[in-house]
């Protein structure tokens, strides 16, 4: 059986570029077929409505993954309205601002995975250009991967896939990813590696607070430019911490790897030269 997954990308968070790729990391999985629709960097109600309706009415997947910033914003709320009424099981993946709407999403019949370490970018024209944007997102992706947050997202979607394959009701996740949930998913062998990953997660959370201050709460240019710059410096060091954590695991040949088998099963290994089982 091939499970058809529909992914809606509206706007961008750190998890957006890899949410589909983490389900099929070698492009050799034969039990899923993924279709991705998106509205680019924008997530206004008009853009979101167009792609959400197309996903529900034309693509008609077995389930839908919607991903983007702040699920409580007007555009994502419009998507939630369409997806809730569409009759297709749907999970909303978002960042920390969505936590305040998690009960509303549950009432709408939607699942959610809200990632506290996926921070807002320093979106000030005087600071953010395409290069800075790309480097920030690269650092965030390293934090998501190295702390275990990415693995929590991947496992939640895989559980939905497996339910379809087994003919069971699709479980709609209701997850807020904290530092503890993230590092638990990584199966760290070295407690210092785990501690470094937890520190990186908390630093990334703080980056969001700093960027909110710089983007929305500070009006003077000479004040908000160094504020958002400091947030980007912080995420760079959070990414370094997860690199340090992984190097500690490498030193004792204890890196947790969980690749997908061709038929979709999640395999497991720790020793570099061992076969995944």
From Swiss-Prot:
Pathway: One-carbon metabolism; methanogenesis from CO(2); 5,10-methylene-5,6,7,8-tetrahydromethanopterin from 5,10-methenyl-5,6,7,8-tetrahydromethanopterin (coenzyme F420 route): step 1/1
Name listed for the protein in its UniProt record: F420-dependent methylenetetrahydromethanopterin dehydrogenase
Family statement: Belongs to the MTD family.
Top EC category: oxidoreductase
Enzyme Commission code: 1.5.98.1
Keyword terms, alphabetized: Methanogenesis, One-carbon metabolism, Oxidoreductase
Any one Pfam family match given in the protein's UniProt record, by short name: MTD
Gene Ontology MF annotations: ferredoxin hydrogenase activity; methylenetetrahydromethanopterin dehydrogenase activity
Function: Catalyzes the reversible reduction of methenyl-H(4)MPT(+) to methylene-H(4)MPT.
Top-rank taxon, per record: Archaea
Gene Ontology terms: biological process: methanogenesis, from carbon dioxide; one-carbon metabolic process
Keyword check for Cytoplasm: no
Catalytic function, reaction form: 5,10-methylenetetrahydromethanopterin + oxidized coenzyme F420-(gamma-L-Glu)(n) + 2 H(+) = 5,10-methenyl-5,6,7,8-tetrahydromethanopterin + reduced coenzyme F420-(gamma-L-Glu)(n)
